[in-house]
């Protein structure tokens, strides 16, 4: 039994001699040590296969065997003040706990096999005891895995957004694995913008949106740029003076003059130099040359400072050192183009002119987006607006002659003119000499201006003018020119209410409309034909009668077609521009001064009697005959001036 106790003592000595000082860490409380020792003893008693139980029973209780190693460990343990720095040097507490647990199992006699045993360990020997190595190598503390770097977040102000330092792209996972091509990049520092003096401004983070339709992320930059342009344009509209040429973004001068003080932001006197004291300017104000010299001096100083800096460093934006009155104006951004609706038609080189005209037309009419066909399959119209079909049923406009009121005049001539005017008689029966019309002008003027059936007469006259050929329109034009000439001779205003003068624009536009498709057949001279076509476009297509009169004043008429067009234009132009353009009024009056009864009928007959020899097709003759008309409708015509 004594020999058994000596063997146990040797075993404990070898165990304590092989343990490294760093493994003996008893910094925990004594209560935890007692609990761990009791648990290890219970496990060793139940699981151990070695015959240690008889030796313990002979030697006494097991606490006596464990008192000696505990006393030695306590002697080697440093005080609590020295234990804390030693624990920090040894490593994290998790590693220490892992190192203490197997050693205490060996102290308690636990000889269970382990997954990874040292090279010197072996299984139980023939005596039933575990063979231990002569000296156990100290275990090196395991290094913990490196933790990912924390993303530092800097909050400058309560309203600032938190921007992580990581600039890597953050792909969006999709179903099935992989990443979608649609990614949202982290804030990317924009390139340093060039300042006013050439210095580099601080970079600003921009959010770029990358998608298959926006691969380079230009949409976000473009939207911000357009917004800044709109704000600048509104600001310029408020501050810009409404002087001469105020609508120009910069003066007509050279770019050098614009750099020295011209431009949209230059204030009053855009594009002009500041007047000196001798020119009536402010004596205290600096000249333009002084302002430019003052602006160049800081730039030179800024360049010298930039040369002194090491490579890769830029200067910040230079603060404004001069008053706003002396500093040159900032360059204004160009005007943004107006947004156009998406056109379904595609640009083709062969139809470039047509495409350009299409764009101009859409810009002119300001077509709203909901009226544009965005797709090829879009319907051509709103089918809900189409009513039910009524084949063969057309409702004509009935004449208002039945609503006319009875009126009686004491003058027999006026009564005779009224009776003939309502009936579709021949032109010869309605012919009245110009001298008799001049003699009976006052009672006839009273009827044309104060008749109670004014609306009914206009209805009948316009119906005959619009629904008839050129022969009927030329007869109404004869009546119009003769009556306008008599009004001017008697000092009447052409703008007053008058039954005959009120239809002047209708006669002019309808005659131009009938002449336009056959002008090439009626006029062999191309310059005269082109002039007549342009006047017809201004009157019929655009309704610009005054512009057509101004064009007439700039050219010289010399053919039956152009003279007929000039006589049809003179009366409507005189009615509209008497107070607006007196010179044009006097020019058109010269046509009425040389008017004679029957002159327009003679021009018309000369023009239609001999057609252009180049037109030999039957379709051309058919168009001319249809425009001239086969019947002269004189319903509503009061008189035909004669000699």
Swiss-Prot record:
InterPro entries reported in the protein's UniProt record: ICP27-like
Q: What are the Low complexity biased-composition ranges?
A: 57-71, 83-100, 162-171, 284-297
Q: Transcription regulation: is it a keyword of this entry?
A: yes
Ranges of biased composition (kind: Pro residues)? 320-329
The family annotation for this protein states: Belongs to the herpesviridae UL69 family.
This chain's protein is named Immediate-early phosphoprotein 57
Highest taxon of the source?
Answer: Viruses
Specify residue ranges for compositional bias: Basic and acidic residues.
103-113, 215-241, 298-307
Where are the residues of the annotated region Disordered? Answer: 1-180, 194-329
Name its GO BP terms in alphabetical order.
Answer: regulation of DNA-templated transcription
Name one matching Pfam family.
Herpes_UL69
The top of its lineage is: Viruses, Duplodnaviria, Heunggongvirae, Peploviricota, Herviviricetes
Supply the alphabetized keyword list.
Early protein, Phosphoprotein, Transcription, Transcription regulation
* Acidic residues bias (residue ranges): 24-52
